Amino acid sequence: MRIEQLKKVTAPSAQEICVLATAGGFKLTAREGASPAEFLNELIAAKSLNEAVQFFAFALPAREAVWWACQCSRGELSDPIPQPLQDAVEAAETWVRKPTEEHRRAAMSRAQATDFKSPAAWAAAAAFWSGGSLAPENLPEVPAPAHLMGCAVAGAVMLAAVKSEPQLADQKRERYLASAIDIANGGNGRLASAGS
């Protein structure tokens, strides 16, 4: 997998994205002058797939990042899907399609109805943390820190890779990265089945 371009990633340098990821507690260090695509290619070539996932979580714009978390989360939901998890991922997808304040807050409500041990919960939390206020409505605004959404997206995707069949985590990460690359270039990021 070689990345030539990332149309939707607007940061001119990988270092800029690494600063945001570092604020979220991740240890990503890009070489000076590396573009986001160059840095991702370096991570993938070094088989640093977890770090590549983390980098993408902070590199993608908010809606695209949450959509990616939803795609990876859906891939790990198995029948019968517990209703709170279904509700959480659907709330996050609704926010992606129509990013209103009402949908953003509904996503967090659905995330809180889970045990926060699933990728779906973190995808929904990412939608809430994408912007706006963290405070309850009608209280003074408490802006979400810029790194919070990326942390939730990274958590959703990394958890999706190991939640079931952890021995296949690297193969899942490769699929998830292919999805992120597609999203970053204007695609829908739908995951190919594991066998394809």
PLM features: residue spans?
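Short, glycine-biased loop/turn motifs at secondary-structure junctions and
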Residues: 1-117, 132-196
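Alpha-helical transmembrane segments of helical membrane proteins, especially in multi-pass transport
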Residues: 122-130
